[in-house]
From Swiss-Prot:
Gene3D superfamilies: 1.20.1530.20, NAD(P)-binding Rossmann-like Domain (3.40.50.720). Pore-forming subunit of a potassium efflux system that confers protection against electrophiles. Catalyzes K(+)/H(+) antiport. One of its GO terms (cellular component) is plasma membrane. GO terms for biological process: proton transmembrane transport. One of its GO terms (molecular function) is glutathione-regulated potassium exporter activity. NCBIfam families: 2a37, PRK03659.1. InterPro entries: Cation/H_exchanger_TM (IPR006153), K/H_exchanger (IPR004771), K_H_efflux_KefB (IPR020884), Na+/solute_symporter_sf (IPR038770), NAD(P)-bd_dom_sf (IPR036291), RCK_N (IPR003148). This is Glutathione-regulated potassium-efflux system protein KefB. Belongs to the monovalent cation:proton antiporter 2 (CPA2) transporter (TC 2.A.37) family. KefB subfamily. The chain crosses the membrane at residues 4-24, 29-49, 55-75, 87-107, 115-135, 152-172, 177-197, 207-227, 230-250, 268-288, 291-311, 324-344, 356-376. It is a multi-pass membrane protein.
């Protein structure tokens, strides 16, 4: 692809994403499906703007590579060791059982046994990019089903190596015999990467961070991710596995959060590019000529994988409410199928349209997953949003709540417990199904689902409630919910959690005056105690705390985001001088009346 063509392709990708994803979100089908549909539209079987799909698909795999690096940063070796049973137990069982069943079914459709084995293994793999994206959207990361799903995906990445090695053996063209010297060199290179990463990465990043230039740190992070991906690709191993290992090696370093911040924007764009590329690869010609075969294949593929995953989740002891989420989110074919089937085709394992049919099946199965997860959500809503159980009635004597609490993480739990302790009738909206199960055991009235859905808010009693407390983790969800409440439930008193000053500004601009910055009050209290330990009288420290809070809130209201940076800096300096003057006056006054104050805490 020439430079001008590459630039044109980039513009088309961005336009497709900007046009399709917001529309898909408004239709309620999710961003992932929006990307896939955008790819179909601009691909060779749609409007035909882009024809070189294979090259773009290979490049777009970098989205998965960046995603795996960030996941590696969230784990450390000890955490990975704790997951060994689920990785090598459930993960291995899923790959083996799904491969065997799918290979058997392919043999019934006139595939040779060698092609059926390769087809079964390829179809048994799930899409790492899609599954992890959906797990984050559904709040599954903290749940047992999310941890188990990640373990299965990690084993599938590990299984890439033997699967690719199996293809030439099945084709009978394994270069007469294995070149054990070459294999040994690859193993040594892999071990060298592990040892080098373990002892060299931290000193290197420490040296780069000492320069104080943020752009260089970002460049070094990109170099690490892309370099480890290319190194693993040169060894014939999974690029995603290489960056995952690099992430794990840096998970306990002091640069973990900075690395994640540097990579995150690239990850999002490249993941979108990956999904668009998958949509472009859908061969509508094959779909049209073999429509019945493809539809049956997609249904059978999804059904077999759901059955295997559900049974394994049950054997592993996953809660019944989480099994369908776990099975549904991993029910599609994955990006590895494109690599494996291309390798098998080069070895002449497939005949006629067999490879094209398998790839169409994989692509369509990926498109079914967002829709399937919506059905699972609706099923869970019916299961958990029904009438109250008998053991919950003593806690909720009146069906009409006084307060709705959205989100029940660490922040929301404190609020909920305080309200319950004071006999307030509350209803909780939570999207983490494991948290829903736990809260119901302790008598909370809980609705499962996305709080930005108006119907769910109505079911939870928003029309009768007096207040709503929004404690969402994501600022975007908070602002969307504020807008919905102001539009559909204007009588509600809105109280919200702000993660920092930026979110506080947004809430003020939206007309929400009752909010709490999650670290502000606790930091102020600790600061007051620090002043006392430094010799300041408790009364004086208390007054300093109150003055600081009052002045900070006034600054927050005055320094709206539209102001120029220089204006904000100037106003901040002026406020600091004003605060110093207040403190000095207070100190002079307190020296005259210290004895009139009882010891505070």
């Amino acid at each position: 692809m020439e430079g001008s063509d590459f630039l044109l392709a980039g513009v088309l990708f961005l336009f497709a994403a900007v046009a399709a994803v917001p529309l898909a979100s408004r239709l309620g089908i999710g961003a992932v499906l929006g990307y896939l549909l955008a790819g179909i539209a601009i691909g060779p079987w749609g409007l035909g703007f882009i024809s070189d799909v294979d090259e773009i698909l290979h490049f777009s795999e970098l989205g998965v590579v960046f995603l795996m690096f960030i996941i590696g940063l969230e784990l450390n070796p000890s955490k990975l060791w704790q997951l060994r049973r689920s990785i090598f137990g459930v993960g291995a069982a899923q790959v083996l059982l799904s491969s065997a069943l799918l290979a058997g079914l392919l043999m019934l459709t006139h595939f040779s046994w060698q092609a059926a084995v390769v087809g079964g293994i390829g179809l048994a793999m799930s899409s790492t990019a899609m599954a992890l994206q959906l797990m984050r959207e559904k709040g599954m990361n903290r749940s047992e089903s999310g941890q188990l799903g990640f373990s299965v995906l990690l084993f599938q990445d590990l299984a890439v190596i033997p699967a690719l090695a199996l293809v030439p053996l099945l084709a009978g063209s394994a270069d007469e015999h294995f070149d054990w010297m070459k294999i040994g060199m690859k193993v040594l290179a892999f071990v060298g990467m592990l040892i080098g990463g373990r002892y060299l990465l931290r000193p290197v990043f420490r040296f780069i961070a000492a320069s104080g230039v943020r752009e260089v740190f970002t460049a070094a992070t990109l170099l690490l991710v892309l370099g480890s991906a290319l190194f693993m690709d040169a060894l014939g191993l999974s690029m995603a596995l290489g960056t995952f290992i690099a992430g794990v090696l840096l998970a306990e370093s002091e640069y973990r959060h900075e690395l994640e911040t540097a990579i995150d924007p690239f990850k999002g764009l490249l993941l979108g590019l990956f999904f668009i590329s998958v949509g472009m690869s859908l061969n509508l010609g094959v779909l049209y000529t073999h429509l019945l075969w493809v539809v049956i294949s997609v249904v059978v593929l999804v059904a077999v994988k759901i059955l295997v995953l559900y049974l394994l989740a049950r054997l592993y002891g996953v809660r019944s409410s989480e099994r369908m989420q776990f099975a549904g989110v991993l029910s599609q074919g994955g990006e590895f199928a494109f690599v494996l089937f291309s390798t098998a085709s080069s070895q002449r394992l497939f005949q006629g349209d067999q490879m094209a049919l398998l790839l169409v099946t994989v692509t369509l199965s990926m498109m079914t997953t967002p829709l399937l997860m919506k059905l699972v959500d609706k099923w869970l809503s019916r299961q958990f949003n029904g009438p109250e159980e008998e053991d919950e009635k003593p806690w909720v004597n009146d069906d009409k709540p006084q307060v709705i609490v959205v989100g029940f993480g660490r922040f929301g739990q404190v609020i909920g417990r305080l309200l319950m302790a004071n006999k307030m009738r509350i209803t909780v909206l939570e999207r983490d199904i494991s948290a829903v199960n736990l809260m119901r055991k302790y008598g909370y009235k809980v609705y499962y689902g996305d709080a930005t859905q108006v119907d769910l808010l109505r079911s939870a009693g928003a029309e009768a409630a007096e207040s709503i407390v929004i404690t969402c983790n994501e600022p975007e969800d908070t602002m969307k919910l504020v807008e919905i409440c102001q539009q559909h439930f204007p009588h509600l008193h809105i109280l919200a959690r702000a993660r920092g000053r930026v979110e506080a500004h947004e809430l003020l601009q939206a007309g929400v005056t009752q909010f709490s910055r999650e670290t502000f009050s606790s930091a102020l209290e600790l600061g007051r105690k620090t002043l006392v330990t430094l010799g300041m009288h408790p009364h004086q420290a208390q007054r300093a705390q109150l003055h600081f809070r009052r002045l900070d809130m006034r600054m927050l209201r005055e320094l709206i985001p539209m102001h120029a940076d220089t204006v904000q800096i100037s106003r901040a300096r002026e406020a600091r001088r004003e605060l110093e003057e207040i403190f000095q006056r207070e100190m002079q006054q307190e020296r005259r009346q210290l004895d009139g104050w009882d010891e505070f805490e």
